[in-house]
Amino acid sequence: MGEDISKIVIIGAGQAGATVAFGLRRNGFAGEITLVGEESHLPYERPQLSKEMLRPEASAHKSIKTRADYEEQSILLELGCKVVRADAQAHSIVLDDGRQLAFDRLVIATGVQPRRLSSAFQGAHRVHYLRTLEDAARLRADLEAGKSLAIVGGGVIGLEVAAAARALNCPVTLIEAADRLMSRSVDEVVSAYLDRAHRRNGVDIRYGVAATELLDDGRLRLSDGGTVPAEAVLVGIGVTPNIEGFEHLDITDATGVRVDAYSQTVVPGIFATGDIASQPNGGGFGRIETWANAQDHALNLVKNLMGEAVPYEAPVWFWSDQGPINLQVVGDAANGRRIVRGDEHGDVFSVFRLDANQQVIGCATVNSPKDMAVARRWVKQRSSVDPQRLADPTIPLRDCAV
């Protein structure tokens, strides 16, 4: 890193932001590092909000690092602050209390926020969104009270919360506008398994409908005219990027802050990482909203901030724990030739996806972490496999590559 770089400001005190801050110190950056976050808490990882913090044995949340760690590494924390404007010409940001912070390099790691239902649902105490520790605590209180829960959205958040709510013996109805669960991430085989597993666990699943009205009698009206029990409502219908304060810089696109393979925006000296980054992906650009990407993309950005010029090329990988179900997905698990390994009607199987050259382009595993360990390596290396051998679970995976 050049000698003129003495101040780095990171906006967003979550996993990606904290990873950049500590990564810079590990790589020898001796200048000033300031981490700015809207929440008053020390940075923490958000996956625990829909997992550990809602389970029957829930404990206090876990921070990424202790306050002493930040002090030891001379990382300045500006928590409970919101950035209202970033000035690329003046190389400074303005906080909501009027203070200005100067920077030589600016890292945007502001993440995303839950997409909201229509204005008819705004302000209702029964309606929950899951973004912060306070959100999780409020939802947890309703679940512990045994309230009936209507979940709007059949994605990862909705399914994880459904499993947690059933573990607390809450009646659960899940409402999904599409015709299957997790339709953006997995194929029909995995969606069908998730449907069977959650119904077996007591979840009432409704497809092809939307929430239209919150009724005073503790029910929720649907677009087909029916109603479902809804003493509490959890909304998980996607997210929107936190770009407030950066719109005027012309660094955003339809999905977030646009960056190249080096995490650089079109404005010199301004970078983005984590969920907010609209990054090269599958021939286009888009956000990758996973724990692994927030971690690995941030670590790769550190290399570039230190002057190494290393492009980010890791395949998409995420996991979801839904009660006893461990689902993992790598690469493109919804397109290409489908090879099912194991019994898709059981509770342990894998679905591989191959291109026309028999190269592995994606995989989804259900309760099969060993298969995923191999699949991640194959997807990264674009390994070719024998489809017939791959479909035979009696043949070790290592013997399926060609």
Swiss-Prot record:
Belongs to the FAD-dependent oxidoreductase family. PANTHER family: APOPTOSIS-INDUCING FACTOR 1, RIESKE DOMAIN-CONTAINING PROTEIN-RELATED. GO terms for molecular function: ferredoxin-NAD+ reductase activity; oxidoreductase activity, acting on NAD(P)H. The p-cumate 2,3-dioxygenase multicomponent enzyme system is composed of an electron transfer component and a dioxygenase component (iron sulfur protein (ISP)). The electron transfer component is composed of a ferredoxin reductase (CmtAa) and a ferredoxin (CmtAd), and the dioxygenase component is formed of a large alpha subunit (CmtAb) and a small beta subunit (CmtAc). It comes from Pseudomonas putida. Coiled coil: none annotated. Component of the p-cumate 2,3-dioxygenase multicomponent enzyme system which catalyzes the incorporation of both atoms of molecular oxygen into p-cumate to form cis-2,3-dihydroxy-2,3-dihydro-p-cumate. Ferredoxin reductase catalyzes the transfer of electrons from NADH to ferredoxin (CmtAd). Keywords: Aromatic hydrocarbons catabolism, FAD, Flavoprotein, NAD, Oxidoreductase. This is p-cumate 2,3-dioxygenase system, ferredoxin--NAD(+) reductase component. One of its GO terms (cellular component) is cytoplasm. FAD binds at A16, K51, V83, R131, D275. The lineage of its organism: Bacteria, Pseudomonadati, Pseudomonadota, Gammaproteobacteria, Pseudomonadales. The keyword DNA damage does not apply. GO terms for biological process: catabolic process. It catalyses: 2 reduced [2Fe-2S]-[ferredoxin] + NAD(+) + H(+) = 2 oxidized [2Fe-2S]-[ferredoxin] + NADH. Pathway: Aromatic compound metabolism; p-cumate degradation; acetaldehyde and pyruvate from p-cumate. Induction: Induced by p-cumate and repressed by CymR. Its EC number is 1.18.1.3. Its cofactor is FAD.
